From Swiss-Prot:
It is found in: Membrane. Detected at low levels in fetal and adult brain, in particular in the frontal lobe, temporal lobe and cerebellum. Detected at very low levels in skin, liver, fetal ovary and in placenta. This is X-linked interleukin-1 receptor accessory protein-like 2. It is a single-pass type I membrane protein. Glycans are attached at N63, N120, N136, N211, N328. It comes from Homo sapiens (Human). The gene is IL1RAPL2. Its EC number is 3.2.2.6. Keywords: Disulfide bond, Glycoprotein, Hydrolase, Immunoglobulin domain, Membrane, NAD, Receptor, Repeat, Signal, Transmembrane, Transmembrane helix.
Length: 686
């Protein structure tokens, strides 16, 4: 009988020892330790704060006075690592008052844990409190780390109290509290009422969320406490809703074996308090964790959130799909109100689908490439076709007379060697001929159409303003003589180019590098706002279906094609150097019924055998001609000209000719035939 009794005694001893160890698990050196209290104290630097010993408010049923009367002493320590150091109160910045520590002006270094110990020779109990002191954030009246948090459902009633106000009350009066929202005074709505030290919102709206700061004065210092109010939707009474896959509508996904796969499950969760969304995948009755290692769940992703309502996603990930993975997978979503689920069926993809997809995408890609190539090669032709059939006439109601103003250089063949006669003929003959005769445009050519009515500059400015385009034929001679100077000297013309009031078409007749100062050309291009550059390539551009003429017509105004009568442009005997293109003379033509007494033999400078038979004339001006100078005899079909060189319109005198008396020059040559030298004895820029 003794062995069983001894065994029972040993067991009782062990149990008793274990019970004693459990009862002393939270005690150190015989002192009961309640660890850290849930309440945290927070203050801004420079503000007063009171840290109260939590033993008298949450752990023992007695107050400080009663405990002191029974011989218990209250001592304070500050935790520094694993050590607790006694606090020496300076009475200046920090003092002890009954069951509390008063920080009269808290500093950031005061942050930490403070332990109050209540003990005598036979009894000991302690607890720690947390204090956080922080500086204001830049531009704010609070620090986001030391805000209090309150929540309220939308449309509900909410009261926001000013924390720790009891610590700053005086026995005879309530503290005067001022409320701010986002650190600014606010005109509260009628349903928001300040009730004592609290702010009462009778019906919370979404816009009521934010930071509320209460402010009061204590011992000459400001005390601020900030509370963040989070507004949420009404507490839901419904289970979550699957968004993909859809509930009661299984989705079928065709997969290719050996390829990775990612299947998302999306669901909507109404606001259900502090509980987070619960979402997971299953294969039949097994959780994903129970399946093979190549199948796993991803992380829960928050897609959207509004007032606590969330849309989340959980992906089912296959590193490489195998035959055994072709099955039904279910996504489950839960909250405290219930559970919903939706399914996905994996099915093997036939190879024909891939071939069809590749063929379709390839055909679309080839079609896009073909369209791009066609556009790159025929973009101008396409635009001209569109303009011809659908474009509006640009010349309607714009109050402009001419389609383009032609600016070029006429070179004196006797005084300047011309390296490019083909370019000269193009600028003076071919270009106007084709634009007027073939395409029906109306050009203003100064040498032909200028009718003096004022000063030369005013006349040119007026005609440029009446033109829809400005065509500049850019030859080396044009650049050497700075043919564009007229557009820089006249302010109105310069403003038209700079502001884009008129579009400029710049035609380059040759490669300019190495022949002229290209910096001036580039400066000219930069000064023009609306500029199109077209290059004339000689014989390559001679045919009407060449890229040059199509590009030029594209840059010209949109208008219906109007063919001008040939008699207005060319003589029947005139032929050009370009075969298909017919030239017009460098000086516009006209004829007169008046004839001179002198015969052809009397005109030593008249050369009927020239390679190009060009009828020369100049515009008639208001010049009184005596009737006696027109005799009856006729010279036949010869043309007559006023001997008034067009260069004199600028007030210039012919080069290499010195006139002693300009008036005598005009008086003695009022009506004489002009020789070819007189017609080209200088370089005129128009």
């Amino acid at each position: 009988m003794k062995p069983p009794f001894l065994l029972a005694l040993v067991v009782c001893s062990v149990v008793s020892t274990n019970l004693k160890m459990v009862s002393k698990r939270n005690s150190v050196d015989g002192c009961i330790d309640w660890s850290v209290d849930l309440k945290t104290y927070m203050a801004l630097a420079g503000e007063p704060v009171r840290v109260k010993c939590a033993l008298f408010y949450s752990y023992i049923r007695t107050n400080y006075s009663t405990a002191q009367s029974t011989g218990l002493r209250l001592m304070w320590y500050k935790n520094k690592g694993d050590l607790e150091e006694p606090i020496i109160f300076s009475e200046v910045r920090m003092s002890k008052e009954e069951d509390s520590i008063w920080f009269h002006s808290a500093e950031a270094q005061d942050s930490g844990f403070y332990t109050c110990v209540l003990r005598n020779s036979t009894y000991c109990m302690k607890v720690s409190m947390s204090l956080t002191v922080a500086e204001n954030e830049s531009g704010l009246c609070y620090n986001s780390r030391i805000r209090y948090l309150e929540k309220s459902e939308v449309t509900k009633r909410k009261e926001i109290s000013c924390p720790d106000m009891d610590d700053f009350k005086k026995s005879d009066q309530e503290p005067d509290v001022v409320w701010y929202k986002e650190c600014k005074p606010k005109m509260w709505r009628s349903i928001i009422i300040q009730k004592g030290n609290a702010l009462l919102i009778q019906e919370v709206q979404e816009e009521d969320g934010g930071n509320y700061t209460c402010e009061l004065k204590y011992e000459g210092k400001l005390v601020r406490r900030t509370t963040e109010l989070k507004v949420t939707a009404l507490l839901t009474d419904k289970p979550p809703k699957p968004l993909f896959p859809m509930e009661n509508q299984p989705s079928v996904i065709d997969v290719q074996l050996g390829k990775p796969l990612n299947i998302p499950c999306k669901a909507f969760f109404g606001f259900s308090g502090e509980s987070g969304p619960m979402i997971y995948w299953m294969k039949g009755e097994k959780f994903i964790e129970e399946l093979a290692g190549h199948i796993r769940e991803g992380e829960i992703r928050l897609l959207k959130e509004h007032l606590g309502e969330k849309e989340v996603e959980l992906a089912l990930i296959f590193d490489s799909v195998v035959e055994a993975d072709l099955a039904n997978y279910t996504c489950h979503v839960e909250n405290r109100n219930g559970r919903k689920h939706a399914s996905v069926l994996l099915r093997k993809k036939d190879l024909i689908y891939k071939i069809e997809l590749a063929g379709g995408l390839g055909a679309i890609f080839l079609l896009l490439v073909l369209l791009v190539v066609i556009y790159k090669c025929y973009n101008i032709e396409l635009m001209l076709f569109y303009r011809q059939h659908f474009g509006a006439d640009e010349t309607n109601d714009d109050n402009k007379e001419y389609d383009a103003y032609l600016s070029y250089t006429k070179v004196d063949q006797d005084t300047l060697d011309c390296d490019n006669p083909e370019e000269e003929q193009f600028a003076l003959e071919v270009l106007p001929d084709v634009l007027e005769k073939h395409y029906g445009y109306k050009l203003f050519i100064p040498e032909r159409d200028l009718i003096p009515s004022g000063t030369y500059m005013e006349d040119l400015t007026r005609y440029v303003e009446q033109s829809r385009r400005l065509i500049i034929v850019l030859t080396p001679d044009y650049i050497l003589r700075r043919g564009w100077s007229i557009f820089e000297l006249e302010s109105r013309l310069h403003n038209m180019l700079v502001s884009g009031e008129i579009k400029v078409i710049l035609i380059e007749c040759t490669e300019l590098k190495g022949k002229v100062n290209c910096q001036e050309v580039e400066s000219l291009k930069r000064s023009i706002k609306l500029l199109s550059l077209i290059k004339w390539k000689g014989s390559k551009s001679s045919k009407l279906n060449s890229k040059f003429w199509k590009h030029l017509v594209y840059e010209m105004p949109i208008k219906k094609k109007e063919m001008l009568p040939r008699c207005h442009v060319l003589d029947s005997a005139e032929q050009g150097l370009f075969g298909e293109l017919q030239p017009i003379p460098s000086i516009a033509m006209t004829s007169t019924s008046a004839t001179l007494v002198s015969s052809q033999a009397d005109l030593p400078e008249f050369h009927p055998s020239d390679s190009m038979q060009i009828r020369h004339c100049c515009r008639g001006y208001k010049h009184e001609i005596p009737a006696t100078t027109l005799p009856v005899p006729s010279l036949g079909n010869h043309h007559t000209y006023c001997n008034l060189p067009l260069t004199l319109l600028n007030g210039q005198l012919p080069l290499n000719n010195t006139l002693k008396d300009t008036q005598e020059f005009h008086r003695n040559s009022s009506l004489l035939p002009l020789s070819s030298k007189e017609l080209s004895f200088t370089s005129d820029i128009w």
